[in-house]
Amino acid sequence: MKTYSAKPSEIEKKWWVIDAKNVVLGRLASRVANMLRGKHKPSFTPHMDCGDNIIIINAEHVTLTGKKANPKDGKIYYRHTGFPGGIKDTTAGKILSGKHPERVIKMAVKRMITRNALGAKQMSNLYIYANSEHPHAGQQPVVYDFASQNPKNKK
């Protein structure tokens, strides 16, 4: 028996919509990363973009467990300006209460995807919105009820 390798014409992409209201961030991000890669499909091929398109709504209501949500000493995200001494930091709580709360989910998923050109292509199939409205109704996305799959998914 030969190893199956999907061809680009055989790949079928579905559209999913996931409600992130009161859902634990890390659990959501790991499931979304697997769906973006296509690992939930029997036709998974590691070198092809065989994952689905995912829409996440209500990103501002995602939950962080433990002390990570504390704005003062919670989970810290670092970045560097490129200049000497230019390291900047912010917390997950500040980002969630700021202008772009969807960035917390995007960063969590991005760090679970491979860091190469294929990973960038897979990340382009992720659409995150802070509130419950999205402009992708024409694609007829299927609702994926992530919160009810495991009691630990919802907080």
Curated annotation (Swiss-Prot):
Entry superkingdom: Bacteria
Spans traversing the lipid bilayer: none
MF annotations from Gene Ontology: mRNA binding; structural constituent of ribosome
GO annotation, biological process: negative regulation of translation; translation
Matching SUPFAM superfamilies: Ribosomal protein L13
GO CC list: cytosolic large ribosomal subunit
Function recorded in the entry: This protein is one of the early assembly proteins of the 50S ribosomal subunit, although it is not seen to bind rRNA by itself. It is important during the early stages of 50S assembly.
NCBIfam families: rplM_bact (TIGR01066)
PANTHER family: LARGE RIBOSOMAL SUBUNIT PROTEIN UL13M, RIBOSOMAL PROTEIN L13
Protein name: Large ribosomal subunit protein uL13
Gene name per UniProt: rplM
